[in-house]
Every structure is written in structure tokens, then in C-alpha cells.
UniProtKB/Swiss-Prot annotation:
PfpI endopeptidase domain location: 3-171
Entry protein name: Uncharacterized protein SSP0918
Domain of life: Bacteria
Leader sequence residues: none
PROSITE patterns documented for this protein: PEPTIDASE_C56_PFPI
NCBIfam families with a match to the protein in the record: PfpI
Gene3D superfamilies assigned: 3.40.50.880
PANTHER family in UniProt: DJ-1 PROTEIN (PTHR42733), DJ-1_THIJ_PFPI FAMILY PROTEIN (PTHR42733:SF2)
């Protein structure tokens, strides 16, 4: 059965960390929905990729989705700057309810705002790892880490492994 995956995103995302997993999800027969600050707007990646925002964070309901993708780049840091903390609250639904959450590179920064990392094993790009550890996570240096429903990965070099695990989780 096809599943629906939310992608939370804003400007300065790492292009390939969005396009590659999104393509893998869609090629596996699942749907993706881009969520951002404003529906029917456009966000631009660090390398110029333009992506339409389908649904605003104000209108998005996490329970409508079967998974969450958080690409890296500077987007996660910008999303964490949301004054109302809506992106962390959105992500918390997934971590607390055992719904798959996929985060790569700087993406796990959003997971810090879920207050649900204590005792979880994660990976991320090097300069995010200390923040994850300070949030209570056990941090390892592996291409992909699966801890229950949370799947994390380090960098674009790990995309093949990350994409494979995303599809495995969605097809379970």
C-alpha cells in the first residue's frame, strides 16, 4: 500500500539530500508532500534546486502522514528558528508515535526539538553530533543508523544506504 511522507523544508536545504531520497520514495510507489512556512511558495536549495511547498506548517497534520523526511543543509537550522517551534512539534508526533522519521546530515537538528532523543542511537554530520549528544542521544559514526522508528544518516556520501533503509521502512 502506498504511504505518504511529509518533507519539512525551507531555503538552503542540501539539494541532493532532498532530491535523492524523494526520488527513491516516489520510485517505490509512495507519495511525498513538501511542508514549509507558506503553501504555494517556493524554496531554493543551496545549489539552486527550486521546490514547491505543498502545505503550510500551520495547516499540516502529522497524523495524515506515514513518515517524515528531514533533509540537511541549512534548512533544519532555519526551521528550528520558527518562533512557535512548529517544526519540532510536528516531528515529535513521529518520534513519540513510532512513525518513521528519516533525517540526514543536519536534519537530525530538528529531532533535538522533540525532546525525545534520550537514550536513542543516532548519527549525523560531524558538527551536529555534539548537539545530539547534549540532547541525550548516543551518537555513532555509521552511514545509516536505525533506532526503532528513527533513521539517521551522515552526509550525501551515505545516500545509497539511507535511501535503501527509507524504502525498507516504508515497505514494511
Amino acid at each position: 500500500m502506498a504511504k505518504k511522507v511529509a518533507i519539512i523544508l525551507t531555503n538552503e536545504f542540501e539539494d541532493i539530500e532532498l532530491t535523492s531520497p524523494k526520488e527513491a520514495i516516489e520510485e517505490a510507489g509512495h507519495e511525498t508532500v513538501v511542508i514549509g512556512d507558506q503553501a504555494n511558495s517556493e524554496v531554493v536549495g543551496k545549489h539552486g534546486t527550486k521546490v514547491a511547498v505543498d502545505v503550510s506548517i500551520a495547516d499540516a497534520k502529522p497524523e495524515d502522514f506515514d513518515g517524515l523526511l528531514i533533509p540537511g543543509g541549512f534548512s533544519p537550522d532555519h526551521l528550528r528558528g520558527d518562533a512557535e517551534g512548529r517544526y519540532g512539534t510536528f516531528a515529535k508526533y513521529f518520534t513519540k508515535n513510532d512513525v518513521p522519521a528519516f533525517a540526514i546530515c543536519h536534519g537530525p537538528q530538528i529531532l533535538i526539538d522533540t525532546d525525545d532523543l534520550n537514550g536513542r542511537t543516532l548519527t549525523a554530520v560531524l558538527n551536529v553530533r555534539k548537539d545530539l549528544a547534549n540532547a541525550g542521544a548516543q551518537v555513532v559514526d555509521e552511514s545509516v543508523v536505525v533506532d526503532k522508528n528513527i533513521v539517521t544518516s551522515r552526509t550525501p556520501d551515505d545516500l545509497d544506504d539511507f535511501n535503501r533503509e527509507i524504502v525498507n521502512q516504508l515497505n514494511d
